[in-house]
A protein has these predicted regions:
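Bacterial N-terminal signal peptides
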Residues: 7-16
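Proline/serine/threonine-rich low-complexity linkers at boundaries of modular beta-sandwich domains
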Residues: 21-29
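Beta-propeller-forming repeat regions
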Residues: 28-33, 42, 51-56, 66, ...
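Short beta-strand elements bearing conserved aromatic residues within extracellular beta-rich modules
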Residues: 61-63
Length: 649
């Protein structure tokens, strides 16, 4: 890579590091077995369950079925030691069948897994590949992005739903509806509702929400940006309930930005600020996961200040937000709230501990160079971010598009390749040490439209120029293992061709989607998730074929076609897909019924993957990746150092 396009701060990379094994284990949520039962055919129920991160490798299980509440019957003649996936064809379909597992430790059966609605098939239930969560969607609203956390400490996930009404992209003027959050148990019980109020604008770039156990009490909290008029889950108002800071009328201002602008008859480019919230206080609030009550509120950092300083006068770039969860010290996670990526970028790390919300550090690009494009840390952010321990010292770094920020808030490096729309961080190439980053970039003045770099140092491994006029912007790009003949992840984008992890073209053809992915069938390759379909790449015929369609469901975010959430939520190590129904009355959680020979711990006990689920709702949603290579020819998955807490009653 040419020196003029790479700015590396080498000093932090040369300092001695502490090996992760010498650090205390990360505290994570205590999960149950996550037993899930899917009636795939009239006389076929597929049951799967979790292997937990700390489980001994040789841990075996017995599987039980209870019909209409009778004494459970063991279904396996010998302990199950392989994949945690079982097909039951001997059940009575006229009975309500509930499944549970018991681990066998040192020859002794352990207590049964907790009873769960997702492990029960009602009598005479139809065959269907999902279970449903009924919603109480307000009129005019749509269930959009979701996240998960154990809100009540019972060892299973609850679902937090961001409900959207009228929304606007940051580049478009107009009044929006008030953002709403609902929290549901898996049986559809509504736990609470939070209304962010009229002073939080609705749109993909405004409300980034984090659901995680930040204080280590065994129960997850919700952290997000709030304002005057936000109503918490117990009906209390934050700030001034009557305040309304929305810009009224057109309020046209001069604009150099073609996005959202109009040209007047006299040739001036003007942009409307109608509906934008460009005044008034901004807050950051921690909400109790059990009740939705506001636990603490602080001023949002950074404040918007001079709107023009972020790149335009009408409110587009000033309100570009991102967020993530990161383990910045030895044990507990922090919330990292971010503002700006086209020009100035500010990241603020917050701790919620012992009932106090405190600021850990602030990174401000403009404190590391001039407020112009010669500053290597300005304009480097994406519409998304990733969190990973890139130097393997047990603490996380924030991969903020084309740059990386250390766990202590200092800059690690900048590639100076600028803004982009997609970002993938994992051990994408297992033939080389450490993690890699695959990213796309939209500025045609920069040398690479797609690039593959060392996540630790930022050093370019390979890159390729972007498109040519009239479409120089590389708008999409992904990195998934879809071809077993080549080590590591295959890589493709809106540019021609399918690349291997070394950047070599292995096919002139490529899959027909450049979006999400999901581990769905029984092998270690990843399948393609686009809209409400799961497909697979056939590397022999170089075609994509359909595996599954989620009938009656639709994806979110228009052409982005994202699921509400995709994650290893239940059952074995493969991933579930959450989609909303077309009438917006349900969330459906789809889980694979395809058998597998592979046994892996739940991906939710891989630290990087779990953090990816926390940030999946942010900006332009991106698929999650673990911190190790999961694919054809993989080595045994690493066993992370974790600790768990039993919540107090």
């Amino acid at each position: 890579m040419k020196n003029s396009f790479l700015f590396l701060l080498l000093l932090p990379l040369l300092l001695p590091t502490v090996h992760a094994a010498s650090l205390p284990p990360r505290q994570m949520e205590t999960l149950g077995r996550g037993v899930i039962a899917i009636k795939s055919e009239p006389q076929k129920i597929v049951v799967s369950w979790r292997v937990l991160g700390p489980d001994p490798e040789a841990l075996a299980f017995n599987l039980y079925r209870s019909a209409d509440g009778a004494v459970p019957e063991k279904l396996n003649p010998a302990p199950l030691t392989g994949a945690t996936h079982f097909t039951d064809t001997t059940f009575n379909p006229a009975a309500t069948n509930t499944y549970s597992v018991r681990a066998i430790l040192a020859g002794a059966e352990q207590p049964p897994s907790a009873r769960s609605v997702v492990a029960t098939i009602p009598a005479n239930a139809p065959a269907r590949p999902y279970f449903s969560i009924p919603l109480q969607t307000p009129v005019g609203y749509t269930p959009n992005d979701t996240s998960v956390g154990d809100l009540d400490g019972d060892g299973e996930y609850e679902i937090i739903v961001h409900l959207t009404g009228r929304a606007r992209d940051n580049s478009r003027a107009g009044i929006t509806d008030e953002p709403i959050f609902h929290a549901y148990k898996l049986d559809g019980t509504l736990l609470w509702s939070i209304n962010l109020g009229k002073n939080i604008r609705e749109g993909a770039h405004y409300t980034q929400f984090l659901v995680y156990d930040f204080d280590g009490d065994g129960r997850a909290e919700l952290i997000c940006k709030t304002a005057d008029g936000t109503v918490d889950g117990i009906g209390k108002v934050i700030g001034d309930a009557k305040a309304d800071y929305r810009t009224q009328g057109e309020d046209l201002v001069p604009s150099r930005d073609p996005s959202g602008s109009v040209t007047t008859p006299d040739g001036k480019r003007m942009a409307s600020r109608a509906g934008y919230v460009l005044a008034g206080p901004e807050f950051l609030t921690v909400f109790d996961g059990r009740t939705g009550a506001a636990l603490a509120t602080a001023d949002y950092v950074p404040a918007r200040g001079d709107v023009n300083a972020w790149g335009d006068a009408y409110g587009n770039r000033v309100d570009r937000f991102l967020a993530g969860v990161a383990y910045l010290d030895d044990v507990l996670p922090s919330a990292v709230m971010c503002r700006g990526y086209y020009t100035r970028s500010v990241l603020a790390a917050w701790d919620w501990r012992d009932g106090k919300l405190t600021q850990r550090w602030v990174f401000d690009s403009d404190q590391h160079g001039p407020a112009d494009n010669t500053n290597p840390y300005r304009g480097q952010g994406n519409h998304n971010l990733s969190v990973a321990d890139v130097d393997a010292d047990g603490r996380d770094e924030i991969v903020y598009g084309a740059m990386c920020i250390n766990a202590d808030g200092t800059p690690r490096y900048s590639t100076k390749l600028g803004h982009g729309d997609a970002l993938h961080v994992s051990d994408l190439d297992p033939t080389r040490p450490g993690l890699e980053v695959f990213a796309i970039h939209e500025n045609p003045k920069h040398p690479y439209g797609i690039e593959f770099r060392d996540a630790n140092t930022g050093a370019l491994i390979w890159g390729k120029p972007g498109g040519t006029a009239p479409a120089p912007d590389v708008g999409r790009g992904v990195a998934f293992d879809i071809d077993p003949r080549h080590p590591g992840n295959e890589i493709w984008s809106t540019l021609p061709g399918l690349n291997n992890a070394r950047g070599e073209i292995i096919s002139a053809k490529k899959p027909n989607s450049v979006n999400f992915a999901v581990w769905w069938d029984g092998d270690l390759l990843r399948e393609l998730l686009n809209g409400n379909t799961v497909s697979k790449w056939d590397w022999l015929t170089e075609t994509t074929y359909l595996l599954f369609t989620a009938e009656g469901c639709t994806a979110n975010n228009s052409t982005k076609s994202n699921p509400a959430l995709s994650a290893d939520l239940l059952g074995d190590w493969r991933e579930e897909v959450i989609l909303r129904t077309t009438d917006n009355k349900e969330l459906r959680i789809f889980s694979t019924t395809i058998s597998t020979e592979h046994r892996l711990s739940t991906l939710m006990h891989d630290p990087q993957y779990r953090l990816a689920i926390a940030w999946q709702n942010v900006g332009y949603n991106q698929p999650p990746h673990p911190g190790f290579f999961l694919g054809e020819g993989m080595k045994p998955a690493p066993r992370p150092s974790l600790s768990f807490v039993t919540p107090s009653k």
